[in-house]
Regions:
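General beta-strand structural signal in soluble alpha/beta enzymes
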Residues: 102, 127-131
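Rossmann-fold NAD(P)-binding glycine/threonine-rich loop
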Residues: 106-127
Length: 139
């Protein structure tokens, strides 16, 4: 069992969180939008994925420190415009040896960096990228 912190509770982040949880991993999801965390915790449903049931084992937090601390894998699932700011907030809590995964697509307009280059710039470590179609409902 891996301990996985997912930063971002949109459709892609939640679809991956569900899949990783039902695969037997310990998953914790964070969102910068506190009302989103409250709703997901209470209803166990995502408004954009109405057919998906959120497993009881899937946990949520409003603390970026908690989602990063003591995790084997950190998965960044925030929109590309928020990758840099989210990585900067997470930086104090990212530990050596953690695997960093990004699922956001895009290029930062000012620097022309890819999302993994932004994570390397902000976190001081290399990450990997998981690309696919935007078919979160197919997971």
């Amino acid at each position: 069992m891996k301990r996985i912190g997912i930063l971002g509770a949109g459709t892609w982040g939640m679809a991956l969180a569900r899949m990783l949880t039902v695969s037997g991993n310990d998953v914790l999801v964070w969102s910068a939008i506190e009302k989103e965390i409250d709703s997901l915790s209470t209803t166990r449903k995502h408004p954009n994925l109405p057919q998906m049931k959120i497993p009881d084992e899937l946990r949520f937090t409003k603390s970026i420190e908690e989602v990063c601390k003591d995790k084997d894998i950190l998965l960044f699932a925030v929109p590309s415009v928020f990758v840099r700011s989210t990585a900067a907030k997470a930086r104090p809590y990212v530990a050596d040896g953690q695997i960093i995964v990004d699922v956001a697509k895009g290029i930062e307009p000012d620097t022309l960096y890819t999302m993994t280059e932004i994570l390397a710039d902000e976190l001081g470590k290399e990450g990997c990228l998981l690309y696919t179609s935007d078919a979160a409902d197919e997971l």
